[in-house]
């Protein structure tokens, strides 16, 4: 799995998990998200950038993505939408699925 990710996804080409860690697809996806965000000039690297896995539920495992833009609020909304569109397009490469729950 990891070799495939390294070959197909340039941002993961040099990824080496910690010793004694068997990486999962969700772990590698979180690494990808962090690397992707740090590669974007619109993301403010001087402020917090956090990608965390939240408590799993009967619907799945939520991932929280927290970052700041270098732009004003109105532009942030567009930037955020573009970034999430990119993540939605990349998720199948990690053999993951998006699930939306609504009442």
Question: Predicted segment positions?
Answer:
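Structured, soluble regulatory/oligomerization domains located on the cytosolic or IMS-facing side
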Residues: 1-103
């Amino acid at each position: 799995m990891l070799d495939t990710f390294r070959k197909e996804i340039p941002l993961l080409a040099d990824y080496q998990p910690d010793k004694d860690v068997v990486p999962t697809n969700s772990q590698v996806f979180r690494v990808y998200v962090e690397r992707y965000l740090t590669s974007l000039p619109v993301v403010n690297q001087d402020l917090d950038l956090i990608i965390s896995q939240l408590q799993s539920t009967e619907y799945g495992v939520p991932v929280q993505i927290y970052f700041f833009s270098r732009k004003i609020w109105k532009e942030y909304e567009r930037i955020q939408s573009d970034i999430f569109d990119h993540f939605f397009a990349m998720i199948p490469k990690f053999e993951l699925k998006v699930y939306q729950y609504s009442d």
